[in-house]
Amino acid sequence: SARPWDRSCPAAAYAAGDRRKAVTVLDIEAYKVANPALNITYQVAPYQNTGLYNQKYLPRKGETSGQVELNYSNNFRTIRYADVLLMAAEAFNKSGNDLKAQTYLNLVRRRAFGDLLHDITATGTALYDAILAERRLELAMEGERFFDLVRTGKAASVLGTLGFVAGKHELFPIPQGEVDLAGLTQNPGY
């Protein structure tokens, strides 16, 4: 059966030459095989194991002070420059300035690929789709994808097979105690 966590990591979506995959996704089993002298062990239970790990938040040697559940002492990235560039690209595309949108999008892609060969020249809807695809890759496993899908109205088509219900899952339920205390109206569907 499908495991929801299997779809949170877009490992197969990265193009050849895209350097982001190596710093985003860690195939722990392949890493163990390639580095037998390290004698790597890791705990799976009680978590689901897809075989892939979020490389962005794995602690590095010497960074293992603090709580394991909080990713040790790793900083949580609230916003990144690439995110700002992609937001600008989307805004310029939506306001009809595709040239400016391409410029911001391609700044991100040039860093990712290290060349000019992967620039996007699409316009209109195709450019918009390219910007959204770039957000998926650039911000992979940083907690943005769900909100991008909801914001763009694509959540039901992408997440429907995982149980997403349009008109309900765009919002989280308000804890019942808060509803009772404050006399709030619960979000739809809960």
Feature locations, PLM:
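Flexible loop/turn segments at secondary-structure boundaries
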Residues: 31-32, 99-100, 147-148, 156
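Long, intrinsically disordered, low-complexity segments
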Residues: 1-3, 71, 76, 109, ...
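Extended, hydrophobic/aromatic-rich amphipathic alpha-helical segments that build helical scaffolds
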Residues: 18-21, 75-108, 128-140
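Flexible, polar/acidic helix-loop-strand segments at domain edges
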Residues: 9-81
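Hydrophobic residues in alpha-helical segments
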Residues: 14-15, 93, 150
